[in-house]
């Protein structure tokens, strides 16, 4: 409830390098790019997520937005700190995404 949200350059750099405008994920898979504005709103996405999956020390939040969805992954370092790891967007319904299906299956 009173956990501290931490975001650092490593998480921002990872999200932009892997899922930003010039990333292979965007160029080759037609994934919508992540922007600095998206990253600045990640806490709102987490707070208003349609679904959140907790696995080991990872927390993965899914938010459906119009014709695409946003995924935010955080690491729970301890009971009171959540560190931004990455975020990405994909077209379609998050429940049909391979990432979601994998996380649900591994969570059982």
Protein language model features and the residues they cover:
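Ribonuclease/tRNase effector modules and their secretory precursors
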Residues: 1-108
């Amino acid at each position: 409830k009173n956990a501290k949200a931490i975001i650092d350059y490593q998480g921002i750099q990872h999200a932009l390098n892997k899922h930003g405008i010039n990333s292979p994920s965007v160029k080759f898979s037609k994934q919508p790019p992540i922007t600095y504005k998206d990253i600045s709103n990640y806490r709102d996405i987490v707070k208003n997520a349609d679904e959140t999956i907790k696995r080991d020390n990872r927390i993965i939040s899914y938010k459906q937005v119009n014709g695409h969805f946003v995924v935010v992954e955080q690491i729970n370092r301890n009971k009171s700190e959540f560190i931004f790891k990455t975020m990405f967007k994909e077209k379609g319904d998050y429940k049909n995404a391979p990432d979601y299906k994998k996380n649900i299956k591994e969570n059982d």
